[in-house]
UniProtKB/Swiss-Prot annotation:
The modification N6-acetyllysine is found at residues 13, 29, 108, 128. The modification Phosphoserine is found at residue 30. The keyword Acetylation applies. Pfam families: Gal-bind_lectin. A beta-D-galactoside binds at residues 45-49, 53, 62, 69-72. Lectin that binds beta-galactoside and a wide array of complex carbohydrates. Plays a role in regulating apoptosis, cell proliferation and cell differentiation. Inhibits CD45 protein phosphatase activity and therefore the dephosphorylation of Lyn kinase. Strong inducer of T-cell apoptosis. Plays a negative role in Th17 cell differentiation via activation of the receptor CD69. Residues 4-135 form the Galectin domain. GO terms for molecular function: lactose binding; laminin binding; receptor ligand activity; RNA binding. One of its GO terms (cellular component) is galectin complex. This is Galectin-1. Homodimer. Binds LGALS3BP. Interacts with CD2, CD3, CD4, CD6, CD7, CD43, ALCAM and CD45. Interacts with laminin (via poly-N-acetyllactosamine). Interacts with SUSD2. Interacts with cargo receptor TMED10; the interaction mediates the translocation from the cytoplasm into the ERGIC (endoplasmic reticulum-Golgi intermediate compartment) and thereby secretion. Interacts with CD69.
Length: 135
């Protein structure tokens, strides 16, 4: 995938919320939101897969520490629809990242890197970002 939006120096602190809203492409196969320290140190690789890498209608999450991927976590809840607008809200603390999906469903992913601030965000794939907000 070619690189889409990249933002750095975010300084997102524990308890603060990152809201990302955008349009899912009508022919979407997958998209990615990466959060962390930099591209080689990700506390969250959030990858909804409509039909990609052998997965269908599955959210795959992972972390990357010093360039090495961790163990994938899969979520069966999949509220994303091709051709629709979707919003994801992500908060974190020392233990977990909490991801709130468009249907209100929330799940947790462990903060394996123990980051005290999220400074990096990258988005890619079949998702056109319309708004990024910090609450």
């Amino acid at each position: 995938m070619a690189c889409g939006l990249v933002a750095s120096n975010l300084n997102l602190k524990p308890g603060e919320c990152l809201r990302v809203r955008g349009e899912v492409a009508p022919d979407a196969k997958s998209f990615v939101l990466n959060l962390g320290k930099d591209s080689n140190n990700l506390c969250l690789h959030f990858n909804p897969r409509f039909n990609a890498h052998g997965d269908a209608n599955t959210i795959v999450c992972n972390s990357k520490d010093g360039g090495a991927w961790g163990t994938e976590q899969r979520e069966a809840v999949f509220p994303f629809q091709p051709g629709s607008v979707a919003e994801v809200c992500i908060t974190f603390d020392q233990a977990n990242l909490t991801v709130k999906l468009p249907d209100g469903y929330e799940f947790k992913f462990p903060n394996r890197l123990n980051l005290e601030a999220i400074n990096y965000m990258a988005a890619d794939g079949d998702f056109k970002i319309k708004c990024v907000a910090f609450d």
